[in-house]
Amino acid sequence: MNITCIIPTLGGGGAERVMLQLCAGLVGRGHRITLLTLYDAPDFYTVPPGVERVQAHADPQAQGMWARLKRVWLWRRAMKRTRPDVVISFMALGVLAAAWLLRVPYIFAEHLDVSKVRLSRQWLKWRLFLLNRAARVVVLSWRDKAYIARHYPRWKTSVIYNPAFAPQQRQLPRPPYFTAPHTVLAVGRLTRQKGFERLLEAWQLIQPRFANWRLCIVGGGEEKENLISLAETLDVQGSVSFVPPQKDLCAAYQYADLLVMSSRFEGFPLVLLEAMAAGVPAVSFVCNGPDVIIRDGTDGFLVPQGNTDLLAEKMAQLMQDESLRQAFGSRAREVCGRFSPEHFVQEYEQLCLAARK
């Protein structure tokens, strides 16, 4: 099959990495894959071998009806060049108007908690128009499927979890930003969604008891200065590192003692899958994704949403007990079997085959 995979950009993020993994997996199964990116932006990731790259060069900032029509025209022109049998789009719904105009079957994959998507009435109508013409809609949880079923046929909605890849078995040098004997790792865009201010508040509660530990937050975003200021206000700046986004976190996972997720909502976080695949125990607030990936009390801890006191308590429980960290970490590696890459690619391939019929 000729499959065109679409994503807004190849900027840093979990959905972008999942898309590249899907492209590589489909190429490995003998399909011709074209990756279409919609907007001009620096690439954070490298396109896998065997995947053709096409860029639409649309302007995401242009406003007004004519600007939107021009975007659809650019997308349609770029898509037509790829001659797709079927289209898979991650996080880019508007581009599917071009697929509809070309009469190409399309699959739309949402990579956020769909209940958190906020749209005006006008955009909601447009969204539903395009969704109801999709061959399939893919979501990341059964909760999302139940939510979207209010507007979209349940039988046309599929739940496909993101995959967990086993890390390479080789010793890597310790990351230079891991400057303490023990590290609590947090990774993600510095936005309100990720709730890092709550993590800093939890860290303040326990940090005096753990002089040999450091909190390392990896990521960039609009909240960076606010978070740095909050760390100073909480007087924890001496035990917290803010690290720019990293293309490869394998070494960080290899040396981290604990991963913490403080998100208000998630899709199916790749960071959590990767860390656990590397044997890192995790603590997370309950939300879509982590509540499926983490087995509470078996390979990590789940904490009621927003309970920073309990988040701090569960972090401390693991930080002070090396044997518990090792036991949780050993069982965490089982994510590679629970969410296998082979099953992930096969499910998308089956959807593409069904969409062509």
Predicted features along the sequence, with ranges:
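Aromatic "clamp/platform" in nucleotide-sugar-dependent glycosyltransferases that forms part
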Residues: 245, 264
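N-terminal strand-loop element at the rim of the active site
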Residues: 5-13, 17-65, 149-151, 159
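Nucleotide-activated donor-binding/catalytic signature segment of Leloir-type glycosyltransferases, i.e.
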Residues: 228-244
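Short His-centered aromatic/hydrophobic patch
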Residues: 88-95, 110
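Conserved acidic donor-binding segment of nucleotide-sugar-dependent glycosyltransferases
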Residues: 286, 295-297, 301-308, 317-322, ...
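Acidic anion/phosphate-binding donor-loop and adjacent secondary structure
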Residues: 63-64, 118, 146-150, 161-180
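Short hydrophobic beta-strand element within catalytic cores of glycosyltransferases
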Residues: 281-284
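A conserved mid-protein helix/loop that constitutes part of the nucleotide-sugar donor-binding site
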Residues: 16-21, 182, 186-208, 222-229, ...
